[in-house]
Amino acid sequence: MRLDKFLVACAVGSRTEVKNLLKAGRVTANGKKEKSAKLQIDEERDEIRFDGQVLEYEEFVYYMMNKPQGVISSTEDPKHRTVLDLLDDIARTKEVFPVGRLDIDTHGLLLLTNDGQLAHALLSPKRHVDKTYLAQVKGIMTQEDVETFAKGVPLKDFTCQPAKLEIVSVDSVKNQSLVRVTIAEGKFHQVKRMVAYCGKEVVDLQRLTMGTLVLDENLERGEWRRLTKEALENLLASIA
């Protein structure tokens, strides 16, 4: 691996910043100052230091984002901002991608990573990874709707797997409900379509959980952070 790529991967700085840091003599390779960005290193064996601190290579990174509305869950889009536009320059150099998708008007928990194996496992239909959503609904959800979800909602093109519908609150004056929906699938507009089947309309949708991951309440919309060590260990253990 080239030294400059290694330094960028270790979040020392952007490619341009790293070259300047090398020129300034702030990087050593195996105890010697190194100024060549093109130097080929063995990230497992060579000792690379920045300002005296040993750097450890991270092959994979994992970010939790509170996706806002109006942003596309994609790596690129010709018309809209994407979730990658919300990351800083260093995070974008990790070549992460969103694990699954949230509709442009849906907000909440989104995992971004460059770990393709983890992403595949979480999205595999065989694993039935639960995802929980909080939905503001126009109309009054009933116990009958709870039972319909539990049986599996028959949509036009497929029948949903049994899902859990919890009625959090009902406001008969405003004709609206707040519900929590847990599904093991992730089909296009699935929660909205399931609610529509019951004769109601989702007006706001937020994802709260994905498998063992739970949205951090302290993350404002559009903010992101690295997964904690504990959260990552639990997530990896859940798909092992």
Language model: regions and residue ranges:
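Basic, flexible Lys/Arg- and Gly-enriched helix-loop patches that mediate nucleic-acid binding at interfaces
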Residues: 1-240
